[in-house]
Amino acid sequence: MTDSSATRPPRLPRRDVHGVLLLDKPLGLSSNDALVRAKRLLRANKAGHTGTLDPLATGLLPLCFGEATKFSQDLLDADKTYEAKVRLGATTTTGDAEGEIVVERLVTCDHDALDAAVARFTGEIEQVPPMYSALKKDGKPLYEYARAGQTVERAARQVTIHAITLLDVDLPAAMFTMRVTCSKGTYIRTLAEDVGEALGCGAHLIGLRRTAVGDLTLEGAVTLEQIDAQADEARPGMLAPVDALLQRCPPVHLDAAAMGRFLQGQRIARRDLPEGQVPPDEGTLARVYGDEGRLLGVARMKEGALRPERLVKL
């Protein structure tokens, strides 16, 4: 009898990995499970995701590793873009294809009516969060009430739909696909249901793919299978650099003297910026680099000086 552990390859130790993984999340996998798998494949010491994507949704799930986790909140707050496939004529218990059909109605709308209905939901709108959501009521997720057959009061929340574009409309099949760019906290399931009610026939979501989070897009995103196929030493190279999260912040480059003071948390007066460096406007958050182009952190211009807000150790 042999010891199976003797033939098992030794587990490699974790390592410091810094950057952003643009993951194309597959259908059926939770965001937390995706994070656990990616962290294991990269052998990363520290990782965090930037807001959940439903198991039934696919697409862009940015995962932050190492020093990039200091900026994950920025992606939580960022606008999102989705492509949503909607079936008209039926409402379900969950607002998506996982639920049981509650009511079926005849679809009589034309393309113009669909255009008008969609237009009603652009701009600032109020949404009532769905019962099948992770929002909590008295410390308990709403979906737990829903699974117990209970409906609880939910306060409407203001969200912003920046744009809705109809990509494909097949009214004989009672289906359409729309691209939605929206603020954080927007429920696309609820939007699909609301459009259906505006048309008088009801609707539910049958497919959802996230294509952008802030300035990050699916272009260059990788799958878990693609990471697994790479040699271990090559996997960290699949991450985007930390400053991929900071592209909306103007860059500031410091010389060696100013860099040393900055890394000690000291403010850098406007007059001490290197010659030729354009100072950011008052109140602006800037990404700060050292004299060798290494990201040092972010700082805000306040009262004529750059004040460090978050430092990174790369």
From Swiss-Prot:
S-S bridge residues: none
An example molecular function term from Gene Ontology annotations: RNA binding
EC number: 5.4.99.25
A single GO BP: tRNA pseudouridine synthesis
List of catalytic residues: 54
A Pfam family assignment: TruB-C_2
Keyword line: Isomerase, tRNA processing
Catalytic activity reported: uridine(55) in tRNA = pseudouridine(55) in tRNA
Enzyme class, spelled out: isomerase
Annotated family: Belongs to the pseudouridine synthase TruB family. Type 1 subfamily.
Function: Responsible for synthesis of pseudouridine from uracil-55 in the psi GC loop of transfer RNAs.
UniProt-recorded name of the protein: tRNA pseudouridine synthase B
Organism: Cupriavidus metallidurans (strain ATCC 43123 / DSM 2839 / NBRC 102507 / CH34) (Ralstonia metallidurans)
Gene: truB
